[in-house]
């Protein structure tokens, strides 16, 4: 089960790690940190592929948001309304971002951004469309 996974991950940290001193909340934080690390590793592998699996990226975003919402209590009713609306409109993944209390989230909606933006605005959000690019590069003539 999940407890066995965490135990193996903890053992991989080294022989001197002992979680017995942690209280329930601290253990939750520790486990969430490990789970988030694993999701990040999976996302990195996916993002480095020649052909991106948008559904997989969306799934990983949703998983990360679930950890933040369900285990760390980092979300708000407004964020949840925007995420629900975005998902219903066709987003493949959504998550809160920033500090969590400011009402900021993003939706991953390749090929469907306008409909998802409209859905976010329909529940009181302010939507901005952004596009990812390769980033800064050196151009030589």
What feature does the model see in each segment?
Residues 102-104:
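Glycine-rich active-site/cofactor-binding loop and its immediate structural neighborhood
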Residues 3-93, 106-141:
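C-terminal nucleotide
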């Amino acid at each position: 089960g999940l407890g066995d996974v965490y135990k193996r991950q903890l053992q991989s940290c080294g022989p001197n790690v002992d979680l017995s001193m942690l209280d329930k909340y601290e253990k939750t934080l520790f486990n969430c940190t490990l789970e988030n690390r694993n999701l990040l590793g999976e996302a990195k592998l996916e993002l480095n592929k020649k052909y991106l699996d948008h559904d997989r990226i969306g799934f990983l975003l949703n998983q990360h948001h679930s950890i933040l919402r369900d285990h760390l209590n980092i979300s708000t009713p407004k964020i949840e309304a925007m995420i629900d609306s975005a998902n219903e409109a066709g987003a493949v993944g959504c998550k809160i971002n920033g500090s969590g209390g400011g009402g900021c989230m993003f939706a991953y909606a390749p090929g469907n951004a306008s409909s998802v933006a409209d859905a976010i605005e329909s529940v009181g959000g302010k939507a901005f469309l952004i596009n990812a690019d390769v980033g800064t590069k050196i151009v030589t003539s």
